[in-house]
Amino acid sequence: MDRNIGKKDKIIVLYRAAIKVMRGCLKRIFLKEVHGMLLIGKHVQISHGKHICCGKNVKFEDYSEIHGLCSEGVNLGNYVTIGRGVMIRPSSYYGGDCGVGLTMGDHSSIGPYGYIGCSGRITIGKNVMLGPKCSLFAENHIFSAVDKSIKSQGVQQKG
C-alpha cells in the first residue's frame, strides 16, 4: 500500500476488503466455478449462478446485478472487475428467449453503471476497460414491416 496512506485509513481499506472477501466466500458455492478470491460488494444480486464461471480475483462492486441464465454462460477471466451498478442480463426476466451469454478476458473491467445485454454472444477481450455507463447489446428489434408494431416483429440475436 502507498506509504502516504495513514494507519487508520489502511485499516479501513483492509476491513472493507475483508468484508467483500467474506461475501465472496459465502456466494462462491452458488456459482459454477470460481478460481482464487471472489470479492463481492454490498447489495450485489447474482441469479442463476450455476451458469457463471469466475477466474482468479474477480470483483463485483456494490449494487451490481449479474444474471447467469443463458445457453453458453457468463465467463469472467482472471482479475475482472464488474463496476458499481453494472447489469449483466443475457435473458428476459419473464420467460422470453434464453440468451447466449458473455465472455470477458483477463484484466478487463466494466465501469460503473454499465449495461451488458448479452442475449446474443458478447465477447470482451483481454485488458479491455469499458467506461462508465457503457452499454452493449447483442440483440436488435426487427422493424421491416411498417404496418406492425416494433414489439410484435420480434428480435434477432447477434453478437
Predicted regions and their residues:
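Extended beta-solenoid/beta-helix repeat architectures
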Residues: 38-39, 70
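Glycine-/small-residue-rich active-site loops that bind phosphorylated ligands and cofactors
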Residues: 46
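Flexible, glycine/small-residue-enriched loop-and-beta-strand segment within the central core
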Residues: 49-52, 60-159
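Terminal amphipathic alpha-helical/low-complexity segments used for targeting or macromolecular assembly
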Residues: 1-37, 43, 79, 127, ...
